[in-house]
Amino acid sequence: LSFQPGDTIIRAAWRQGIEIPHYCWHPGLSIAANCRMCLVEIKAQRPMMLPILAWDEKKKEYVDAVKPKLQPACQIEVTEGMDVSSTGKQAVEAQAAVQEFLLLNHPVDCPICDQAGECKLQDYWLAHQKKLKRKDTEPVHKPKAVRFGPTIVYDAERCIMCTRGVRFCDEVAKDHVLDMRERGNRNEITLSPGRELDHDYTLMTEHVCPVGALTSKDFRFKARVWFLRSAPGV
C-alpha cells in the first residue's frame, strides 16, 4: 500500500478503501486507542516479534520461536516494508475477544435500536461467526434514556466507551461538555456540571457514535435507516 508520512496503519488502509475493524478511531479525531478492536499482526520486524515456545512436529518437542506482537493499527505509524495482517489467526481471535467483552453487558435490543442496520457491533458480530458470549450472568445495568440536551438522548447501557463523542466535542465543537466517570464496566459518559449538550454541532456528536448510545430525539423510534434515502452532504 502507498502511504503518506505520518500515516498510521489504519489510516493508510482507509485511504486505500481497506477497512480494519475499529470502534474508537475516526479520521477526523485524535487517536484514543482504547477499543483495541483494530489489533493487527506486524511481522518481519524484530521489535514487533514476541519470543515463544512452539511445538515442532518433526522434532516432537518445543523449540524457541517468535510470533508477531499484536499492535493497535490506529496507533502504529507505517514504515517502508512493514508486513501487516488484520486477518491472521491471532488478529481475528483478538478481535473476536474484544467483541465478546463489549457484548457482555450490551443490551440485545437491536429490533428497537435506532442504530440497527448501520451498527458496527452488528457488522463485526456477523463477521466473527456469530459467536455467543460465554458468561451467563446478569449484565450490569446503567442509566437509560438520559436527556443530554434539547435534541440528544443517551443510553449508558449501549455505550461502548469509544470516547468519539467526548473527543468530537473537545476537538471539533471546542466545547468540553462531555466527560467520562467511573471505571471498568461502571464507566459511562456524563455531562459537565451545570451543562447540557446544546452546541452548534450537537447532531454531529450523535452522528459519530458507532452504536446506539447517542440518539436524536427527532429520529428516535420514528424511522429505520433502510427506509431512508442518501443525499450529498454539505
List each language-model region with its residue ranges:
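Residues in well-ordered alpha-helical elements
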Residues: 7-10, 157
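Fe-S ferredoxin-like electron-transfer domains
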Residues: 36-233
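A basic, amphipathic helix-loop patch mediating RNA/tRNA/ribosome contacts
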Residues: 9-43
